[in-house]
Amino acid sequence: DVVIKAQVLAGGRIVFSPEEAKLITKQTGAKGRICNQVLVCERREYYFAITMERSFQGPVLIGSAQGGVNIEDVAAENPEAIVKKMGFPSNIVDSAAENMIKLYNLFLKINFDSNSAYRQKIFDLQDWSQEDERLHGGTPANFLDVGGGATVQQVTEAFKVQAILVNIFGGIMRLQGTRVDDAKILACDDLDEAAKMVVKLSEIVTLAKEAHVDVKFQLPI
């Protein structure tokens, strides 16, 4: 009893009749994959992989008596197939162990989610923001990156400057009901009105500094 396996980088390739043979699986994409070779072998497979286990933050070896399929499907539909002892015949134990050691030594897997690609430019946001100011003759005093652990007091104190450049790309934390929302100094739905309030606030702070007067103010939120 043998199987014919298409040699493409995708799972779910084993079929049980010619009518099922397709070059399109859920791992190949709609366009499928070009197959240049096939493998004819005995209908006996093992699944073996190395993955990261969160509970102890280290690699773990996964073995299954059902090869050629996604291990996620096996775990959900047939968990007893994931075995603690592989049950290799004695004549292939040494060969299997050697392959496992080689696989472990090569263990490295990086997955990139294409939906997260847009976030990469966020880390350049600081340089871009400060560079724009310098090109127009300004000198940024600070770049504020508000993390998830920022307190209301920290956010409020950080805004005690003469001018504020708020440059937001996407946003990592929610604004509704969060510390950022609680610590806001000015709240205005109209951008023109908000700009006027910022200018007036800046003028007041400037005059106070020139007069060496410590002015405290409170605006309605």
Swiss-Prot record:
Enzyme Commission number(s) of this protein? 6.2.1.5
Marked site (Important for substrate specificity) residue numbers: D1
Q: Which residues form the ATP-grasp domain?
A: 1-122
Example GO biological process: tricarboxylic acid cycle
Residues modified as Phosphothreonine: T139
Q: Where does substrate bind?
A: G171, I172, M173
This protein's pathway reads: Carbohydrate metabolism; tricarboxylic acid cycle; succinate from succinyl-CoA (ligase route): step 1/1
- Please state where this protein is localized: Mitochondrion
- Residue positions annotated to bind ATP are K5
Gene Ontology MF term list: ATP binding; succinate-CoA ligase (ADP-forming) activity
| Post-translational modification N6-acetyllysine, affected residues | K22, K26, K196
Q: Which UniProt keywords apply?
A: Acetylation, ATP-binding, Ligase, Mitochondrion, Nucleotide-binding, Phosphoprotein, Tricarboxylic acid cycle
Q: Does the keyword Translocase apply?
A: no
What is the top EC class of this enzyme, as a single word?
ligase
Pfam families assigned: ATP-grasp_2
**Source domain of life:** Eukaryota
Residues found modified as Phosphoserine:
S114
The record's note on quaternary structure and interaction partners says: Heterodimer of an alpha and a beta subunit. The beta subunit determines specificity for ATP. Interacts with ALAS2.
Q: Which family does it belong to?
A: Belongs to the succinate/malate CoA ligase beta subunit family. ATP-specific subunit beta subfamily.
So what does this one do? ATP-specific succinyl-CoA synthetase functions in the citric acid cycle (TCA), coupling the hydrolysis of succinyl-CoA to the synthesis of ATP and thus represents the only step of substrate-level phosphorylation in the TCA. The beta subunit provides nucleotide specificity of the enzyme and binds the substrate succinate, while the binding sites for coenzyme A and phosphate are found in the alpha subunit.
Q: What is this protein called?
A: Succinate--CoA ligase [ADP-forming] subunit beta, mitochondrial
Q: What is the lineage of its organism?
A: Eukaryota, Metazoa, Chordata, Craniata, Vertebrata
The UniProt gene name for this protein comes to: Sucla2
